[in-house]
Amino acid sequence: MPQEQYSHHRSTMPSSEGPHIYKVGIYGWRKRCLYFFVLLLMILILVNLAMTIWILKVMNFTIDGMGNLRITEKGLKLEGDSEFLQPLYAKEIKSRPGNALYFKSARNVTVNILNDQTKVLTQLVTGPKAVEAYGKRFEVKTVSGKLLFSADDSEVVVGAERLRVLGAEGTVFPKSIETPNVRADPFKELRLESPTRSLVMEAPKGVEINAEAGNMEAICRSELRLESKDGEIKLDAAKIKLPRLPRGSYTPTGTRQKVFEVCVCANGRLFLSQAGTGSTCQINTSVCL
């Protein structure tokens, strides 16, 4: 009984202690570190923004594109000089209307045409010493599509009406040449020469040599042979001169004349014999030996 009264009395007594308050937050060095990181983040954001603005200004970024590069409905448009450090893949490259398109390189410019397996089919290489083209066939045509020049493994075709060679030494053909007409420019000489070998001209229907406004000369060191197997050899001219034919001896007692007759030996050799009242060829047969 006394314990119950004591307990009831204790419970009814007013508590002298106040309510407990729990403080929530970051204090001390943690708070200073947080402020430092927030300040550092703001500085980085400002630096990043300044760098972005600087890059946009330097690279000349606009709504249409970047610098000399413009994005249009038809593709990309470059104004001014452009430099590509890596391979460029494009369907079509063209310049502005009225302007030329230039390709510049410190070493060479190579254009490759590839198939589906990335194998090179044709190649064009322009270097400091030569321009090389690789392919099965090479053709040069006019604007209208007429063939001017073509070359492949079997033949080289020149489709122009005239082929002119302006070199001082002319043209050298190590093999045979087949053409319907060989002629020089007007008022120019045409010279066919084989310095160390023979020169042969053949045609199934004949070979015609014509000099319309000048002379024609055939000069050789040893023998000049004119042969017709089934036909004739005609010398058709108002004057025919053989100034260097050998002359037979004449008799001192005979009358010396300035008229000679042409004699033919059995071996076909020609010589001159002083004309007399009769034929004097038999007298000068020593020339035929």
Curated annotation (Swiss-Prot):
Disulfide bonds are present. It is a single-pass type II membrane protein. The chain crosses the membrane at residues 38-56. Most strongly expressed in skeletal and heart muscle. Also detected in proliferating myoblasts. Disulfide bonds join 263-288, 265-281. Residues 57-289 are extracellular. Keywords: Cell membrane, Cytoplasm, Cytoskeleton, Disulfide bond, Glycoprotein, Membrane, Signal-anchor, Transmembrane, Transmembrane helix. GO terms for biological process: calcium ion homeostasis; calcium-mediated signaling; cardiac muscle cell contraction; cardiac muscle cell development; cardiac muscle contraction; coronary vasculature morphogenesis; heart process; membrane organization. Glycans are attached at residues 60, 108, 284. Residues 1-37 are cytoplasmic. One of its GO terms (cellular component) is dystroglycan complex. It is found in: Cell membrane, Sarcolemma; Cytoplasm, Cytoskeleton. It holds the Pfam family Sarcoglycan_1. Component of the sarcoglycan complex, a subcomplex of the dystrophin-glycoprotein complex which forms a link between the F-actin cytoskeleton and the extracellular matrix. Interacts with FLNC. Cross-link to form 2 major subcomplexes: one consisting of SGCB, SGCD and SGCG and the other consisting of SGCB and SGCD. The association between SGCB and SGCG is particularly strong while SGCA is loosely associated with the other sarcoglycans. Interacts with DAG1. Belongs to the sarcoglycan beta/delta/gamma/zeta family. PANTHER family: DELTA-SARCOGLYCAN, SARCOGLYCAN. This is Delta-sarcoglycan.
